[in-house]
A protein has these predicted regions:
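N-terminal glycine-/serine-/threonine-rich phosphate-binding loop
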Residues: 4-50
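Short beta-strand segments
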Residues: 12-16, 53-54, 124-127, 152-153
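Ligand-binding beta-strand-loop-alpha-helix segment within the catalytic cores
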Residues: 63-133, 143-144
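Active-site rim beta-loop-alpha module in soluble metabolic enzymes
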Residues: 158-196
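Short, well-ordered secondary-structure micro-motifs
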Residues: 23, 62-63, 135-136, 161-164
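Short, active-site-adjacent cap segments at secondary-structure transitions
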Residues: 19-21, 56-61, 158-160
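Acidic, metal-binding active-site segment of PIN/NYN-like and related structure-specific nucleases
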Residues: 141-169
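Conserved small/polar residues in nucleotide/adenosyl-binding loops
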Residues: 199-201
Length: 201
């Protein structure tokens, strides 16, 4: 297994839910088309990719709706996690449709995803545990899978030390280790349902 990991590079990508559902439908179709092309290219270069999908606006809207009847933060988080898994299923089926070697299930844990990456070129998952953002899940998966890189793909250009939309003095961070990224994403520190972390946009 160790030799196989050295021969085939592993990378983890966190896709913010906002990237999957831009306001204009043409942009959405264009983006998904580009994703398909990229997936074919990556698979042809013997890369293994773990993809963690965020819930985006659908998750936040569902949580807002459920708040009228549910007071439990954990139950509200489960609503958001369900939205991430729905988005993950969309990406999984798109990749299966073009013939990529994709895990046939949406894993519930990062350890399960890491095991599936031994067998498949692509593993797609959503959220896992109430209180954790999908960015934090991606960093945890990078650790579990021994990935070379963890890419946070969102609608903000950099990772910042605080929300650049609220703070003019927010500093962009260009180079981070997995451990530093884990600290920023708040692995092990629960957040309120629907809350955005520093890089969960």
């Amino acid at each position: 297994v160790c030799e196989a990991r050295l021969m085939t590079s592993r990378h983890i990508v966190a896709l913010g839910g906002s990237l999957l559902r831009p306001e204009e439908s043409e942009k959405r179709s264009e983006w998904l088309g580009q994703l398909r092309q990229l997936a074919v290219h990556l698979e042809g270069n013997e890369r293994k990719i773990g993809i963690v999908i965020g819930g985006g606006l659908p998750a936040r809207e569902a949580i807002e709706l459920a708040k009228n009847c549910i007071s439990s933060s954990e139950k509200l988080d489960q609503v958001g996690i369900a939205a991430t898994r729905l988005n993950a299923t969309v990406i999984q089926q798109i990749l299966l449709d073009i013939g990529c070697n994709v895990a046939p299930e949406i894993p519930h844990t990062t350890s399960q995803s890491a095991e599936l990456l031994e067998q498949y070129n692509f593993v797609v998952m959503g959220g896992t545990t109430p209180g954790h953002t999908t960015d934090a899940v991606a960093v945890a998966l990078a650790r579990d899978a021994g990935a070379r890189t963890c890419i946070i793909a969102t609608n903000v250009s950099h990772v910042y030390d605080k929300d650049p939309r609220q703070f003019d003095d927010a500093q962009s961070l260009t180079n981070l280790t997995i451990d530093q990224l884990a600290e920023i994403t708040g692995i092990g520190e629960p957040l309120a349902p629907g809350t955005l972390s520093l890089i969960h946009i």
